[in-house]
Amino acid sequence: NHNDNVIYFKCKDEHDLCRKFLDDWIANCPDVITGWNTKFFDIPYLINRITRVMGEDEASKLSPWNNLYKRETMIQGRKEIVHQITGVAALDYIELYKWYAPGGKSQESYRLDAIAQVELGIGKIAYDEYDSLTQLYQENYQKFIDYNIKDVELIVKLEDKLKLLELALTLAYDTKTNYEDVFAQTRMWDSLIYNHLIERKIVVPPKEKNRKDSAFEGAYVKDPQVGLHNWVASFDLNSLYPHLIIQYNISPETLVQREDYNDVMTVLAPQANVEVLLKKELDTSGMDGVTLTPNGQFFRTTKQGFLPEMMEIMYKDRKKFKKLMLQAEQEYENEKDEEKKKEISKLVARYNNLQLAKKVSLNSAYGAMGSQYFRFYDLRIALAVTMAGQLSIRWIENKLNAYLNKLLKTEKDYVIASDTDSIYLNLGPLVSSTIKTQKEILEVISFMDKICETKIQPYIDKSYSELAEYVHAYDQKMIMKREALANKGIWTAKKRYILNVYNNEGVQYSEPHMKVMGLEMIKSSTPSAVRDKMRELIKLMMTGTQEDIQEFIFTFKHEFRNLPVEDISFPRGVNGLKQYSDSATLYKKGTPIHVKGALLYNNYLREKNLTTKYPLIQEGEKLKFAWLKMPNPIKDTVISFPNRLPKEFDIQEYIDYDTQFEKSFIEPIKVILDCLGWETEKSGNTLESFFG
């Protein structure tokens, strides 16, 4: 290898290898180690191997304190051993990715190869010509070395782009916790509060055991107006839960206990709820020195609580970094030089991480408050936050409808959809009543931007001031800003929509950006080949006709028929192999389709004596499944497989491409097309006639 960063140590045997590795480790003992799946593979393997070859005393030298310990944990139904090297923090990059990367929770596969393809457009070194890594090691040692080096390079490149280690370290320093505590929000907030109070010479109360008796009411999500909408504007409440905590001064020491209620509070408390407050049916004029939340709780407003104070400091910091990030994003859009664009993108990532660290801390506060393991857990406080959130979003929905109905002399619902902290406003009627001549899309977007800024935004601010005054808030902190401006939006159900965005938070796009939420193309359970085509098709929906769509689908049918089975199969995670297996019939009645496929795969591997070449599918693993035409050698309608379908199965000709196409592509696309009143194919152009 010609890489200057690589030093090759030639070792005479495994004992020599372990000795040299340990010597190098001790001489350059790391503070943090990372890699892909290091928690469950690399670290246990290193410790177990050094222990077996050299003994426990030598293995313990991996720790600067000569201390290793291990614990059992359950992962996807499997018992796993986690090893801890005292004094060396282990931040597994796969965990950082799942927790903190923008798309970390919705990937089809979490193999390093798959994630590197998604994020970097490059993958691992392929060794398809060999049956296993062992064979690669034995027959092509140089490629085996290059393969391992490439894995490390991919992690370095992922970090260069995503800055997740930087984010984790920022969070840890911010919260004064250990690096590994970035995966535990209650621990982070316990430390944040402890340090905040100690600085003010306030002693933190001892931790008590709490029991969570039941789940509490969550956020409000409106039933959307299903279908196509032109000229959509979305508005977003900035950091809703942290701001609710500030607005209502929600904190353990400001909560008024029932025994301290005065006569006014005793009357109001049992009557308070979201509906009553929306209609302003309660007379709150007699309240003094307290604010009221929709779950009938009162919080003192005579002095700011420690939680709201902490939120305010964090929010100001986040705002500063987010502003710098948006400036860098606009600079990136305007820059033409590719090298300069790369540098600017790194700057965007850095500012994004800094603002994200604050956002994570802010938003995890509410998560911690709802956890029974949190030192300051109180169901009344958690409920006060969620129900105050419901009140805020429904309040503005009612107000904006009243405003637009008065302006346009109508009685319609102009709020297409709303959820926890966002509303989507139909400005189509306003645009058509104001702009009488044909205009370019960007001209209309510019008009919408002006209307939002000069008319709607001030009205929103005024409406929220009215709410704050009514509930006697400590401070008016409901800050709702315009987010996306789109020429078209399609809703199919709650939290399932597509927006063709031309302007987002003031950043003007040269080409529209698709914002897709909850639909099949961004689901990890959709086949990769189908997902890409869905994105293309939806882009076409925004500009083309029904005929264009039908032609696109017809062409893709041809392509689909020739794709490898791995690209068109459904990704899933498998659980319940033991639960659903049956010694007599192989699987029980009611077995989920992908689990059935996994049991059939394992059985067929055994039948063909292939278990030494291909590993059996294990509980909790990611797999893919495909439908099969009958009759076939498997003697069933489905097969699952881990990454690739073994060629020895010899069942390629039995893959049911018709069913795969219908279930993976046509069915989800039809949901969107039905909203537009469009068909997937011209009459007489059926799947049966196409595939013969």
Task: Walk through the language-model features, giving the residues of each.
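Active-site palm subdomain of RNA-directed nucleic acid polymerases
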Residues: 124, 393-420
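Alpha-helical interaction scaffolds
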Residues: 1-18, 24-26
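Active-site-proximal helix-loop-helix substrate-binding element of RNase H-like nuclease domains
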Residues: 4-8, 12, 43, 52, ...
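Catalytic nucleotidyl-transfer cores of nucleotide-processing enzymes
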Residues: 80, 210-375, 491-522
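Proline-aspartate-enriched helix->loop->beta-strand connector
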Residues: 21-45
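Catalytic palm subdomain of template-directed nucleic-acid polymerases
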Residues: 423-453
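Common nucleic-acid-contacting/processivity interface regions adjacent to the catalytic cores
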Residues: 133-259, 339-399, 417, 426-428, ...
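C-terminal, non-catalytic extensions of nucleic-acid polymerases
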Residues: 449, 453-692
